[in-house]
Amino acid sequence: MATIPSHNLRPHTTNQRTQYSLSFRPHFSRSTLITFPARSSPARAMSRTDEEASISTRLEQESYGLTTAEDIRRRDGEAKESKRLRDTWRKIQGEDDWAGLMDPMDPVLRSELIRYGEMAQACYDAFDFDPFSRYCGSCRFTRRHLFDSLGIIDSGYEVARYLYATSNINLPNFFSKSRWSKVWSKNANWMGYVAVSDDNEATRCRLGRRDIAIAWRGTVTRLEWIADLKDFLKPVSGNGFRCPDPAVKAESGFLDLYTDKDTSCNFSKFSAREQVLTEVKRLVERYGDEEGEELSITVTGHSLGGALAVLSAYDVAEMGVNRTRKGKVIPVTAFTYGGPRVGNIRFKERIEKLGVKVLRVVNEHDVVAKSPGLFLNERAPQALMKLAGGLPWCYSHVGEMLPLDHQKSPFLKPTVDLSTAHNLEALLHLLDGYHGKGQRFVLSSGRDPALVNKASDFLKDHFMVPPYWRQDANKGMVRNTDGRWIQPDRIRADDQHAPDIHQLLTQLHHPSQLL
């Protein structure tokens, strides 16, 4: 077993405390303020206080008047009260392909898109990117304490398992590796998690069902990984998918990342695909046929994580993992943010036939959402697509798209920087202010715009929010008893897979052997 650090250890020299707005729960008024140590709450930025107005309040006063902003928030709040998530969750999950929900923007859908986007953002906030850390490439927190360590309280979800992938594939700009010789794993990276909504009555009342959520890590702003893609489609049926059509193809790099494994590594001796399918199967068997229990499967991810979200959502449906023992079909939805194209037109058609719903949130200026397949894609003339459909570089987006434009936000610089336009926190900010085509940009939930600069330099300078401000105190270094600065040890990572994983895999590939 490897050792993974616990970030409950705090520097002896630091006694700073910061106020954070902490919850996955959607809100439309001033957020509840809870005091947490700044070191243990990297996922959230400072919220509004009575003593000092936030930058969002100041901008509202400067731009369009606080009364207008408060009126819009009040209107959204009233609309949300009249149409609660528990009563409309199937439509929010795409039952009708989100018809009539995006223009004007439905406040419940907006709230859910932000909530699932924050689940994807948690993968960034918890990931150890530091090459000078011997734990680089791992999650900084144990799964039982993931949300608490990020300062996210009342999430309503419990992390069921962590996901790992082997780095022995040709995506060098995606994986992070330590410069230390003795590391937690030489060939694995943490990729995300599978979570399930808890038994709390408030959670069940709010969601209206039990939700299995899969969150994939992507890339914060670096776009070099796009150049690593082979831009070559290959049949999914050759990678263990139970697909009857050999013409259904996906980008080979995404397939490799999802299906490859390294039997010499405890963390990735099972592929990310096998880890996801077996855990979802376990949860479906546990909850799927409970009387009065409704279930949903929601997959989320940003950037390359968005590609994995689409691929795994398709896989869950293709393999029939979303069917209970009694034959009930569980809806599968993917919410992606700045995700690239994944497969060809036959892949798109197959996803639609399986009933998988995909909603893609994109910044119109984001190049990743236009890749791969820059020239041969769903926007090409239909006649050309029919002729070129069999070519290994002819791609098609799937599902529905919600296009946003960062130049509409009065908070953000009108930059043309490609990596900045790809930022997930910026997308969540744009979601918060979007009310429909041609409508004024007004923040609806009070989500703090300072979060945008957590890992970017996107906010206008006069708001005085430093760029790239999110970091651990003293970059994670602490003083030991001798007064020397060291990296603290972390709690051991759980590199043991479930004891019944082989049995579950057998059942997946040979359904007749179901017990």
Swiss-Prot record:
One of its GO terms (molecular function) is triacylglycerol lipase activity. One of its GO terms (biological process) is lipid catabolic process. It is found in: Plastid, Chloroplast. It comes from the Eukaryota. Ubiquitous. Highly expressed in leaves. Disruption phenotype: No visible phenotype under standard growth phenotype. Decreased dinor-12-oxo-phytodienoic acid (dnOPDA) formation. It holds the Pfam family Lipase_3. It catalyses: 1,2-dihexadecanoyl-sn-glycero-3-phosphocholine + H2O = 2-hexadecanoyl-sn-glycero-3-phosphocholine + hexadecanoate + H(+); a 1,2-diacyl-3-O-(beta-D-galactosyl)-sn-glycerol + H2O = an acyl-3-O-(beta-D-galactosyl)-sn-glycerol + a fatty acid + H(+); a 1,2-diacyl-3-O-[alpha-D-galactosyl-(1->6)-beta-D-galactosyl]-sn-glycerol + H2O = acyl-3-O-[alpha-D-galactosyl-(1->6)-beta-D-galactosyl]-sn-glycerol + a fatty acid + H(+). The keyword Cytoplasm does not apply. It is an enzyme of class 3 (hydrolase). A motif (GXSXG) lies at residues 301-305. Residues 1-44 form a transit peptide. InterPro entries: AB_hydrolase_fold (IPR029058), Fungal_lipase-type (IPR002921). Induction: Not induced by wounding. Induced by wounding. GO terms for cellular component: chloroplast. Keywords: Chloroplast, Hydrolase, Lipid degradation, Lipid metabolism, Plastid, Transit peptide. SUPFAM superfamilies: alpha/beta-Hydrolases. The active site is at 303 (acyl-ester intermediate), 366 (charge relay system), 422 (charge relay system). PROSITE patterns: LIPASE_SER (PS00120). Its EC number is 3.1.1.-. Disulfide bonds: none annotated. Acylhydrolase with a broad specificity. Catalyzes the hydrolysis of phosphatidylcholine at the sn-1 position. Moderate activity toward phosphatidylcholine (PC), monogalactosyldiacylglycerol (MGDG), digalactosyldiacylglycerol (DGDG) and triacylglycerol (TAG). May display dual sn-1/sn-2 substrate specificity. Could be involved in early wound response. Belongs to the AB hydrolase superfamily. Lipase family. This is Phospholipase A1-Igamma1, chloroplastic. It comes from Arabidopsis thaliana (Mouse-ear cress).
